[in-house]
């Protein structure tokens, strides 16, 4: 009967999925997380600042595919077990998120379209302050393409600086934006926060300049 189905179907789903999650999906996630951690550390140790720059440049596409969630086991291991700091993913993510907002800001300042200007300012604040980049990406940067190119160029440059200065985060960032910058404070590396701020500023300036040059309002309106 339909009434029994509506009651039993969710119950049976839970009964089946809980053991499956603990016995199959959990170990698989742990296994993949371990190998992902190994790969990220290899990338950093082998390529150094180039690895951080590459991560920062492609981070928008990692976010769009939802793959950033796959890095949680790696981040938890780095920040809670060993070595208690993380030098590549979070620096790249924060720089990338801020630069998505800066690209949208450049469009807002350059365009004469009132609606686009309003959207640019609001999505820029959302990305820079809250670390939520989807509005900026989908409403502006991906839509007009050149702002995304500008953000990727700026993020690569900012990531390069962060890698060269060996910046690292010391706690898990809830919002990957300017709000997370205090998490770069370190007693062992007194200049770590300053170096991250420099990296963010360099990336932001490069993003703004690249977007300003590449984005053509006339071409975008065609």
Positions of predicted regions on the chain:
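Short aromatic-rich membrane-water interface segments that cap or initiate transmembrane helices
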Residues: 39-50, 84-87, 184-191
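Transmembrane alpha-helical segments and their short flanking loops
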Residues: 49, 77, 135-222
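Helix-loop-helix junctions within the multi-pass membrane cores of secondary transporters/permeases
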Residues: 76-155
């Amino acid at each position: 009967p339909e009434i029994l189905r509506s009651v039993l179907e969710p119950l049976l789903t839970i009964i089946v999925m809980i053991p499956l999650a603990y016995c199959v999906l959990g170990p698989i996630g742990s296994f993949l997380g371990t190998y992902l951690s190994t790969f990220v550390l290899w990338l950093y140790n082998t390529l150094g600042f180039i690895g951080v720059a590459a991560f920062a440049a492609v981070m928008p596409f990692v976010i769009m595919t939802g793959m950033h969630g796959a890095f949680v086991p790696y981040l938890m291991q780095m920040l809670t077990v060993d070595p208690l700091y993380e030098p590549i993913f979070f620096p790249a993510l924060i720089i990338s998120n801020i630069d998505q907002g800066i690209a949208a800001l450049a469009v807002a300042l350059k365009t004469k379209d009132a609606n686009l200007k309003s959207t640019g300012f609001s999505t820029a604040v959302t990305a820079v302050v809250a670390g939520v980049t989807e509005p900026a990406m989908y409403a502006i940067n991906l839509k007009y393409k050149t702002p995304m190119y500008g953000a990727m160029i700026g993020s690569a440059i900012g990531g390069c600086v962060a890698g060269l200065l060996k910046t690292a985060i010391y706690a898990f960032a809830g919002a990957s934006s300017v709000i997370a910058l205090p998490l770069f404070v370190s007693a062992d590396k007194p200049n770590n926060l300053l170096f991250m701020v420099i990296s963010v500023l360099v990336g932001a300036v490069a993003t703004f300049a690249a977007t300003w040059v590449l984005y053509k309002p006339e071409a975008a309106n065609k």
